[in-house]
A protein has these predicted regions:
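Hydrophobic alpha-helical transmembrane segments
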Residues: 4-12, 65-74, 131-136, 338, ...
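Membrane-interfacial loop-to-transmembrane alpha-helix junctions, especially the N-terminal start
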Residues: 22-35, 91-103, 149-158, 367-380, ...
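Juxtamembrane membrane-interface segments at transmembrane alpha-helix termini
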Residues: 40-47, 139-141, 167-171, 189-198, ...
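Membrane-embedded catalytic interface detector for glycan/lipid assembly enzymes
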Residues: 53, 60, 67-225
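Hydrophobic alpha-helical segments
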Residues: 120, 328-444
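Long extracytoplasmic/lumenal interhelical loops at the membrane interface
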Residues: 122, 283-347
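Aromatic-rich transmembrane-lumenal/periplasmic boundary elements in polytopic membrane proteins
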Residues: 203-309
Length: 444
């Protein structure tokens, strides 16, 4: 188990080193691999360090081994994308500040202003994935502020980043969605940190802070959700969240509650190991590509195919493959590691992560090159589908359907940015016509 954990960690830092060589990246592969390790590594580490204090070590060992294989293959896929593709990346002059604010305001409008439309068939998926454009604006704004050592602007963009996870906690009672968004936005800083070691230290510190916040949240999760889901006033909801501060503590493997939190919610390895064991014993059968076929079908909008036989959610798959009775009040994702394995075994694991690494690496590379050129229309179209793919705890159906919806949203935002720039240019030309530049005056 220890060796598998080391392989996972080394894979992350090899990927970081690789992406920092030419810095032609927005950090999206880092965001994916970091998100994958977040739901596998803490639980495996807790089992490795505490020995027999936690049950199911044999399942965890299998799960983290498969995760390590997936990490290596994912990094190889990203490397393959960088080795075979070289989009033009000549630096161009563009109004990056205006674009960042356009993305931020537009994204918030989608997320909060158009949220009632999320229930509409197909339209809801486009609005949900298209709203992620606020992450792009925050990412670029925060990078510029940090690069310029402008503390005031960094604080402003940091506050903008905090809006989404805070509201997700207050309105939905969930921490995971906000944490995923924060990871996507902050990953760009690992690429543009002044030194490699500074990026490594930053990842380590952020991981410790994140796990500390998680275990404190987990201790109070039931109270928070009871308040939020019970329709309590906003003041009471804030009070249930700030109540964490009364018993706030640093994450510790000597704390049984912390161990339980890491084992229960940040340990997909148990599910992977259970599924692998049941497959080996013949208690369940391999899916033989059925969920991959479902993923292809999910790309077709339900507005076109109302009776489409696929739907989001993978709790039933997890229950069937592991034999567990799962709590219906909690979301259970099959995860990329388990789903790739339960389809084709180890070959599915290798091929799945190679392909996913290449796809995210390709989109990230093209997005970064477009940003460097000042081609924001291409940047949007590449960024949104890449973010939709960063869902290591989701199913192939959710990922492929989300990426397709994000691509449609990307083309919509591409058009919107083009229209906004055209109107801005027309307004500038109109002002110039009304107040022409005076010519040279007579010599004095």
């Amino acid at each position: 188990m220890t060796f598998s954990i080391l392989v996972c960690v080394v894979s992350l830092f090899v990927l970081l080193w690789m992406l920092r060589r030419d810095r032609l990246s927005l950090g999206l592969p880092i965001a994916y691999l970091g998100s994958l390790l977040l739901i596998h590594l803490p639980g495996a580490f807790a089992h490795a360090v505490t020995g027999e204090r936690l049950q199911g070590n044999e399942y965890v060992a299998t799960g983290i081994l498969f995760t390590a294989i997936g990490c290596v293959c994912f990094v190889a896929g990203v490397w393959l994308a960088h080795a075979t593709l070289r989009p033009p990346a000549t630096p161009g002059i563009a109004d990056r500040r205006a674009f960042a604010y356009f993305c931020l305001v537009g994204g918030w409008t989608f997320v909060y202003g158009l949220s009632p439309l999320n229930r509409l068939t197909s339209v809801g998926a486009v609005i949900e994935t298209g709203g992620a454009i606020w992450m792009l604006g925050t990412m670029l704004g925060l990078r510029a502020a940090v690069h310029a050592n402008n503390l005031q602007r960094a604080v402003i963009w940091g506050a903008a980043l905090a809006v989404y996870p805070t509201l997700m906690l207050l309105i939905g009672g969930f921490l995971s969605y906000g944490a995923a968004a924060v990871m996507v936005v902050l990953s760009i800083l690992t690429i543009y940190a002044r030194t490699y070691m500074r990026a490594v230290v930053g990842i380590a510190v952020a991981s410790f802070i994140g796990l500390t916040f998680f275990v404190n949240y987990f201790d109070h999760r039931d109270d928070i959700r009871q308040s939020v889901w019970g329709g309590a006033s906003m003041g009471d909801r804030v009070g249930s969240i700030t109540g964490m501060l009364d018993e706030f503590h640093l994450v510790s493997l000597d704390n049984d509650k912390d161990l339980t939190a890491l084992d229960v919610r940040l340990n997909q390895n148990t599910f992977v190991g259970l599924a692998a064991s049941r497959l080996d014993q013949g208690q369940v059968d391999f899916l033989n590509g059925q969920s991959v076929i479902d993923g292809v079908i999910s790309v077709i909008p339900r507005a076109i195919w109302p009776d489409k036989p696929t739907s989001a959610g993978s709790g039933q798959t997890v229950a069937e493959m592991t034999g567990l009775q799962l709590n219906t009040d909690t979301s259970w994702g099959v995860g990329n590691v388990m789903e790739f394995y339960i389809n084709f075994g180890i070959p599915g694991l290798v091929g799945g992560f190679l392909g996913l690494g290449w796809l995210i690496g390709m989109l990230d590379l093209r997005a970064a090159a477009a940003e460097r050129r000042g081609d924001f229309r291409t940047l949007i179209v590449c960024f949104l589908p890449a973010v939709a793919l960063i869902d290591p705890n989701g199913s192939i159906v959710e990922i492929s359907g989300g990426a397709a919806a994000a691509l449609m949203a990307g083309f919509g935002w591409r058009w919107g940015w083009g229209m906004w720039k055209s109107r801005e240019l027309a307004a500038a030309q109109n002002r110039a016509a009304r107040f022409p530049q005076p010519g040279p005056g007579p010599a004095i």
